[in-house]
A protein has these predicted regions:
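N-terminal chloroplast transit peptides
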Residues: 1-16
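Short amphipathic alpha-helical segments that mediate assembly, nucleic-acid/protein binding
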Residues: 2, 19-20, 46-47
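Short, flexible beta-strand-to-coil junctions
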Residues: 10-11, 73-80, 129-131, 144-149, ...
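N-terminal secretory signal peptides and thylakoid transit peptides that target proteins
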Residues: 15-28
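ADP-ribose/NAD+-binding catalytic cleft of ART/PARP-like enzymes
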Residues: 36-120, 192-213
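ADP-ribosyltransferase catalytic core
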Residues: 112-172
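Active-site and NAD+-binding cores of ADP-ribose-processing enzymes
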Residues: 145-213
Length: 213
């Protein structure tokens, strides 16, 4: 059944015209949108979220989620949202730690030096395959990157770090094995143009809408 769901979602993504440009543009002008200098969040309905996931969610991400489970972030909103979140891993305020900000800068420096593929913390976000862990940051919501997405994973959590940034950079798995990451309950660093977030309280309805029951 799960294999059929993956094929159905992938088929819909291949056949349907992309709605991503429309969705992102709508987020910029919607009355319900809250925007910062480099971030936009728009509240949407669950049916809109389901449709966007089916037509625009990254196929590799969807495939891994179907195989292994959802990936979450903590968000401020209690309803489904279309998101272009500001990048904050370089900010000491994110973890209330200057060392954390330095760590992510060092991680990027190591990746840049090695010309490694994949995301960079300066233009990426962290999600985790554990709703309780995500809830420490707000309302736990499953995350569905839209369109082209790159991701990397390795440590159980990126911060607090158990290893030096250069060591982590050398051991990251990039754009592969996301289902393994999810099964292990690890964090994943990902970069995309926009994403859909659906609160865990609506997960049963989301699963029904996506045919994942």
């Amino acid at each position: 059944m799960r294999a059929l769901v993956v094929l159905a979602l992938a088929g819909a993504q291949a056949l349907a015209p992309s709605r991503r440009t429309f969705l992102v543009a709508a987020a910029g002008g919607a009355a319900k949108a809250s925007a910062s200098t480099d971030g936009v969040v728009q509240q949407i309905t669950l049916p809109e979220a389901v449709k966007a996931i089916i037509t625009d969610a990254n196929p590799d991400w969807v495939r891994a989620v179907v195989q292994a489970g959802f990936v979450y972030r903590g968000v401020a909103e209690a309803s489904p949202t279309l998101r272009r979140d500001p990048y904050d891993l370089y900010s000491p305020a994110t973890y209330n730690s200057a060392r954390a900000a330095t760590y992510f800068r060092s991680l990027d420096a190591a990746l840049d030096k090695n010309r490694a593929p994949g995301p960079r913390a300066r233009k990426a976000h962290l999600a985790v395959a554990n709703a309780e862990a995500a809830a420490q940051w707000g309302t736990a919501a499953s995350i569905w990157p839209l369109g082209a997405t790159t991701y990397a994973w390795g440590p159980t959590v990126f911060w607090p770090a158990k290893d030096r940034a250069i060591t982590v950079a050398e051991s990251l798995r990039v754009d592969e094995g996301l289902a393994d990451c999810i099964r292990d309950g690890r964090e994943v660093l990902y970069a995309c143009d926009a994403s859909i977030a659906v609160p865990v309280s609506m997960e049963a309805s989301l699963r029904a809408g996506l045919g994942l029951l």
